Amino acid sequence: MAITKMEAGIHKGQYQVRIQPVNPVTKKRIKIPVQYTGSKQEARKIEGELWAKVKGGYDYDQAASFVPDCLVDFIDHQGTLRGWSKRTRSAWNNTLGIVSEYFEGVRMERLTEDVVRSFARKFIADRHLTVGPNSVIARVLVHMRAFCHYYVGAVFLRNPVPRGAINVFFKEEEQSLKQERYTLKREEVDELVAEIKKELDFSNPLICISRLAIWVDLQTGMRPQELQALRWSNLVGDDENGYYFHINDAWNDVSKKLNGHLKKRKHGESRDTLPISFELKESLDKYHESQKQYLREKKIVNERDLIFLNLNDYQKSASGFPVCQTSLNEMLKRLGDKIGIDTDLKWSLYSLRHTVATKLANTPGISYPWAASVLGHTVSVFMKTYVHVNEEIDGKMRNTIGKNGLF
């Protein structure tokens, strides 16, 4: 009987509700917890709800599983199915460590929005962390939302981790602003290029690698990974129409290999960068000759045709590795110190990308779709992520308004 009135025991006088459906695939009986209620009418209602869940695809076995165990299965399955990179899998494993600590003994069926909210706030309090769009808790909640979405319909009626969970779980006054990146002023760009040119010595290609890479980035705004993957064959154009890079690849510093595609682009997709100056083109030509001579002397073959091959390490250059991002960032900071850049803002190769994007956005008559295209972005992402107020334009606008205000 699905509904039985108990005649003895602690549930005496109550109605027991039990259903025993069979899994159509495995032919095994599905274990569903027995429930008790005080009236037969309520018992029939519960019975109907239980059968409705079964027919709707509710997975009782999964619902009774512990959250960390399900996350392990999810990571293994999705990582294999989607071919996650080492970096992606490492990020998910970090989330797994946190979930295992805070959701130990919690079953999937008990995972609600309130439970997730309590976890998020306790995690921040325990570790004295800040809350923001790039914070640890933001990443963990994004991962948890993706994980829970996988079980919507089978365990959850709706995702217990809401979209934009940071803004749902924390008030604005509890959040920290995203740390801005430093963007160079025009005179600082000129000073940085002047310092690079002063230090270049084409008789010693080892000195030129990082400095030329920074100069190229200052003129093109490429991502560091794209800069590392640059081949000599990517440099195209002519004296009449100018020179630029036609790129289609990016380097992965973690896996130590080329991705075979640009960021978030299909294999085979390519794009043209911003034009480079004739002075930079001539410097690259001189460096190319110096690089070839050095490789001949060391009996190294540049099989990947990399422009910024790591010549400072024989084993890495022989293996076809480009200069690493750490070396490029260290060189940029050293050059920045020389020209007097002192800032608490983020200051790295990506600052050059932000600088280029900001300059593009404030160039009169510029086409935003074109500007976004040469940087490898959609217009919306270009505007939201990389466009900053240009200090020169800001000063002009304030002078235009004048000291007496707008009215």
Language-model features, listed with the residues they occupy:
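N-terminal DNA-binding module of tyrosine recombinases/phage integrases
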Residues: 11-16, 21-114, 118, 292-293, ...
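C-terminal catalytic core of Y-nucleophile DNA break-rejoin enzymes
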Residues: 259-286, 303-334
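Catalytic-site neighborhood detector that most strongly recognizes the C-terminal catalytic loop/helix
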Residues: 183, 251, 375-399
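Basic, Lys/Arg- and aromatic-enriched nucleic-acid-binding interface segment
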Residues: 138, 164-224, 228, 240-241
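Short, basic (Lys/Arg/His-rich) helix/loop patches that form interaction surfaces
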Residues: 198-204, 293-303, 314-322, 326-373
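Conserved tyrosine-mediated DNA breakage-rejoining catalytic core shared by Y-recombinases
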Residues: 11, 18, 230-286
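N-terminal DNA-binding recognition helix of tyrosine site-specific recombinases/integrases
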Residues: 4, 95-98, 109, 129-169, ...
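Short, polar N-cap/turn motifs at the start of nucleic acid-interacting alpha helices
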Residues: 235-242, 365-385
